[in-house]
């Protein structure tokens, strides 16, 4: 084999490299939070949501989804059924996140050779990395009039001596998506029987 010379600096860390990262945090994150992880990130450049109803929506990065998009929780791989079946919801709750990172390009190789689409890292402090001074808490409630969705989120965290603790909970309830008036497919109208049309005349559109 021919000799190969590799030259690099001694003290460069992964954080020092140029990474194509989108970061959602603070007020921007609170404004963008949706019912699912995919809906939360849908406004980011190059990201869409593979929606299977009000409660299921996985992020799609540059057309890649499922196991080609690595979902992390605090930098640790999150294994759930959503990686192999898009009609399952991610086990991560975006309403509990303090920030969400979306990583694309060659930098995704840092997280394994399967993340060719990208990486979504959700930081929610469920595993505390430092001691909390005193006790902190958060309580938030959201309502969606389209699906009559109600979401309540609460967390409490603190420390006792050298032990950090964190408790959180989420309650979510959603109904069908409803619209005012009617939603009729013109193609189906040609094949609909008269009795069905009479029933539709007094019904409200439901998706």
Report each predicted region and the residues it spans.
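Short, acidic, small-residue-rich periplasmic hinge/interaction motif at the N-terminus
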Residues: 1-30, 38, 66, 124
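N-terminal periplasmic accessory domains that precede
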Residues: 37-40, 57-60, 69-72, 87-92, ...
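Short acidic/polar hinge/loop motifs at secondary-structure boundaries
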Residues: 77-106
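Extracytoplasmic beta-strand/coil segments of soluble accessory domains associated
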Residues: 38-80, 98
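Structural signature of outer-membrane beta-barrel domains
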Residues: 11-13, 66, 78, 125, ...
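Outer-membrane beta-barrel channels and translocator barrels
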Residues: 34, 66, 160-163
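Transmembrane beta-barrel outer-membrane domains
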Residues: 52-54, 90, 113, 144-149, ...
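Periplasmic-side early beta-strands and strand-to-turn transitions of outer-membrane beta-barrels
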Residues: 134-140, 144, 151, 155-207
